[in-house]
Amino acid sequence: MTLFNILIIGRSNVGKSTLFNRLLNRSTSIIDNNPGTTRDFKYVDFYLNGLLLRLYDTAGCDLLSPESFLQKDILHINENLLTDADLILFVVDSKNGLTSNDIEFAYYLKKYFFKTFLISNKHDSRKALEDFWEPLSLGLEYSFP
């Protein structure tokens, strides 16, 4: 049976682990308000409509300042996972708005990966509602606020 790899990726503290838990309908990943809670990747295999899926929760990565040893390691791991991904869920934080890291990441994903869905998370604040359409400026083909 074919295994389909789905990768949840984005910068730190955008809600990747929350999305992971919600998609699985259980608390599998640790969730915390402090950035950097997830330091490695986690995955769960499950069936959906007869398809075998592997859903990955990844550590947040900062493409623009990979100076720390941990950040370099995270970038390397995520890059390896990206090459095997059949679908990428790129999560951004609408509450705090897009960052230069989000823009750089979107450019990288558009250039090298075709099956990327943009997930605009944290729409529960006034600022997020005011800037509702901002994530669409990243130009990813599939976008979900």
Give, region by region, the residue ranges found by the protein language model.
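Conserved G1/Walker A P-loop phosphate-binding module
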Residues: 1-69, 81
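Short glycine-/polar-rich loops that comprise or flank the Walker A/P-loop
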Residues: 4, 84-88, 112-116, 139-142
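Structural beta-sheet core signal
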Residues: 8, 90, 118-120
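Short, glycine/serine-rich, charged loops/turns that create anion-binding
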Residues: 13, 95-96, 123-124
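Switch II of P-loop NTPase G domains
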Residues: 37-40, 52-54, 58-108, 127
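Canonical P-loop GTPase G-domain recognition
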Residues: 114-117, 122-145
